[in-house]
């Protein structure tokens, strides 16, 4: 698979990324592992997730695959923060305190101490 550099960061990403929005929700752990295995065997290394996907379950599935299906250093993981659903209501909060707290939770679910790309999931006109 063709690889691309992410700006001047030195990070090398597969041109195609593996989206995981349904993992832990519509896609069970075994099917997710099969998808991930096929993606990696095809030369992919860029896995995209979010704290909101499956209420964190997508990140948990990826965390469970690290060390069993792939080595952490062999993939680039992107996740997102800033959107939560307290009491079932979509809330956007990009304050520093909220973002850092969400990053800590994502790292715990992903069972890693870093992510390669961390994104704001939605514009917050207040922060």
Residue ranges and their predicted role:
Residues 1-2, 46, 83, 87-90:
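Generic preference for well-ordered secondary structure
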Residues 74-80, 117-118:
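Non-cysteine beta-strand/loop elements that form the S-adenosyl-L-methionine
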Residues 1-76:
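N-terminal binding-site loop/beta-alpha segment at the start of enzyme catalytic domains
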Residues 59, 80, 102:
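Acidic-residue sensor for enzyme active/binding pockets
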Residues 21-23, 50-52, 80-84, 120-123:
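Active-site beta-loop-alpha junctions enriched in small/polar residues
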Residues 86-127:
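Glycine/proline-rich, positively charged
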Residues 12, 80-85, 114:
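Short, basic/glycine-rich phosphate-binding loops at helix/coil junctions
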